[in-house]
């Protein structure tokens, strides 16, 4: 699955309550304010107070620093098309997801309500339920147990009974839950059994007889670019907006692919188990630097027997290169070249990373109309929102353009940073970026 992986952020420590710099030029530097924008910062669902929020003019000059309050909010008077950069450090728990050291949102408008983490519903444990299986499956060498929030266990021999957890944000509004078990061998799945049950009900749950897996649909690709060095197709079964079972088929070099690949069959759940099918196609232009290339993602409901993806019509233009200019390390510049017009996308996501005292990252969310080179904004001399230092060692940049038929840039700005890591999945856990029911198209071009 192609995702916007962000890796690990800075591990340095600085007080989030440090006083803002006293030499701020002030908001007037950017011109008369046209309204206010609010950013809400949480860490793992908990409001983060004292986080530095740097206000920058449309030309990138920094004007002021404000800090989030006890509710994790900061409100700034802004002009149209300004920028906000949120500083770190981020993670309260070194074992949890670490955010970039710096996160810049470009194209900020008066009235924007921005987030740095998706708004998370309550995650309360409702119950632990015991399930009785219907018997062993002949030839099965593994049994996968799944339930809400993608809770997962695996057994290498037949378990007569298993336990699953039911959480408030993973079940239906009527507190019903679903659990299912997939029996398989080294070649793939063999059978599935599942049951819906009251998440808080004390009655025992006995799973029904096993159902056989289907081996449909087929997914083919036509009009693949001549430069393609790899094509991968995959399917994801989904239920209640979460991925439940996936199957993929990479087709690697030698190229060319004569314009595409023929339809290949995929394992899927029986249609009464998973109500929706998502499938994806990824074209890689460089085996050595995959996933550089164009990715096309679909979600379909209901299941159909076969699909053919016309890459010529569906793919975003190819990103052919990306480069980083660090002649002025405090304001690096990222440039890219493309085979076509990427302004048709919804957003650009640019990431740089460097090694100074520790490994650091800077993620920039920008309108797709942004032209290269993208000059990163100026930052104040404060420890928790500091620019890359002189002498830093930089990694190659990452550039991504994304477009979804149910999103626009205004919506993406409100998704929250972890949502950006999943915006290339139609079943993203962030409800703000998850595709609604029906047939949808998500496209991405990545270097």
What positions do the PLM features span?
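Preference for solvent-exposed, low-hydrophobicity sequence contexts
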Residues: 37-42, 51-326, 421, 430-446
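Conserved aromatic anchor
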Residues: 326-343, 376-378
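Signal that preferentially marks extracellular ectodomain short beta-strand elements
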Residues: 165-171, 261-273, 371-398
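Charged, amphipathic alpha-helical stretches
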Residues: 31-33, 42-46
């Amino acid at each position: 699955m192609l995702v916007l992986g962000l890796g690990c952020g800075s591990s340095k420590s600085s007080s989030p309550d440090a006083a803002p710099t006293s030499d701020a030029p002030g908001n007037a530097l950017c011109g008369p304010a046209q309204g206010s924008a609010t950013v809400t910062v949480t860490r793992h669902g908990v409001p983060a107070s004292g986080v530095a929020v740097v206000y920058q003019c449309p030309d990138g000059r920094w004007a002021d620093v404000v800090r989030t309050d006890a509710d994790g909010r900061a409100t700034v008077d802004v002009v149209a098309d300004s920028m906000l950069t949120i500083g770190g450090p981020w993670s309260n728990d070194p074992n949890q997801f670490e955010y970039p050291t710096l996160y810049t949102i470009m194209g900020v408008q008066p009235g924007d309500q921005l987030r740095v983490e998706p708004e998370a519903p309550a995650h309360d444990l409702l119950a632990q339920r015991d399930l009785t299986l219907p018997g062993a499956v002949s030839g099965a060498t593994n049994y996968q147990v799944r339930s809400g929030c993608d809770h997962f266990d695996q057994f290498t021999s037949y378990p007569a009974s298993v336990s699953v957890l039911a959480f408030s944000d993973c079940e239906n509004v009527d507190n019903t839950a679903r659990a299912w078990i997939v029996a398989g061998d080294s070649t793939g799945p063999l059978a599935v059994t599942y049951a819906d049950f009251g998440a808080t009900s004390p009655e025992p749950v006995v799973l029904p007889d096993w159902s056989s897996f289907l081996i449909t649909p087929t997914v083919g690709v036509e009009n693949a670019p001549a430069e393609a060095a790899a094509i991968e197709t995959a399917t994801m079964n989904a239920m209640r907006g979460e991925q439940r079972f996936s199957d993929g088929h990479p087709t690697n070099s030698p190229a060319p692919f004569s314009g595409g690949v023929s339809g290949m069959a995929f394992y899927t759940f029986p249609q009464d188990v998973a109500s929706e099918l998502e499938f994806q196609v990824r074209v890689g232009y460089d085996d050595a630097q995959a996933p550089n290339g164009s990715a096309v993602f679909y979600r379909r409901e209901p299941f159909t027997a076969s699909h053919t993806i016309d890459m010529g019509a569906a793919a975003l233009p190819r990103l052919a290169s990306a480069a980083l200019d660090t002649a002025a390390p405090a304001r690096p510049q990222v440039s890219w070249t493309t085979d076509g017009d990427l302004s048709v996308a919804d957003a650009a996501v640019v990431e740089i990373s460097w090694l100074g005292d520790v490994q650091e990252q800077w993620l920039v969310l920008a309108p797709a109309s942004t032209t290269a080179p993208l000059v990163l904004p100026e930052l104040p001399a404060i420890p928790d929102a500091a620019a890359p230092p002189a002498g830093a060692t930089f990694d190659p940049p990452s550039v991504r353009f994304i477009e979804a038929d149910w999103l626009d840039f205004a919506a993406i700005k409100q998704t929250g940073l972890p949502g950006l890591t999943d915006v290339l999945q139609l079943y993203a856990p962030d409800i703000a970026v998850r595709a609604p029911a029906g047939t949808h198209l998500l496209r991405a071009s990545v270097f």
